[in-house]
Amino acid sequence: MHNHKRKYHAISNGSGVIVANKDIRNGQANGVGNIGTSTVYFNTAFVKATSAQYADLAEMYQGDESYMPGTVVEFGGTQEITITTTESSPRIAGIVSTNPSYLMNSGLTALNSVPVALTGRVPCQVLGPVCKGDRLVSSMIPGVAQAFDASTYQPGCIIGKSLEDWTNATVKSIEVAVGRV
């Protein structure tokens, strides 16, 4: 292992944690880096990641309200996005993310700003029955998806594909691949 020195000092506590006063050093495999101290810290770190714990790419949007993760949202309302209320809405924005791997427009901190998954895997509220691989669209239930019905198709209405089966005619949170149509 090499500790590449730069102009600042880093100390290892022996457990793979690197405490850096102003710079990050190469640590041990799977190590955790604490940047700064309780009075000096960083707001942004530019890093190269080869893997991520979470599985979606999201973007911050200002909503009409603060929506729960798994809620299907569309462009419209008084702000940028609002909850879906119609079947097969062609204004789909995505699904409110639980904890995105990558977050665009992260500087948006306005009231009711939420991360909306644009692609990847996220939990989504769905009305069954839904089969694995089904294309999903918005339902009449606010913020809830359902299996695609070709008779109600409108361009732009597909949210993604179901990664799970749900056979009951009730609402449940399941994993969905967003943006895969």
Language-model segments: residues:
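Intrinsic low-complexity, repeat-rich intrinsically disordered segments enriched
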Residues: M1-E65
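Extracellular receptor-binding modules and their adjoining Ser/Thr/Gly/Asp/Asn-rich linkers
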Residues: N43-V181
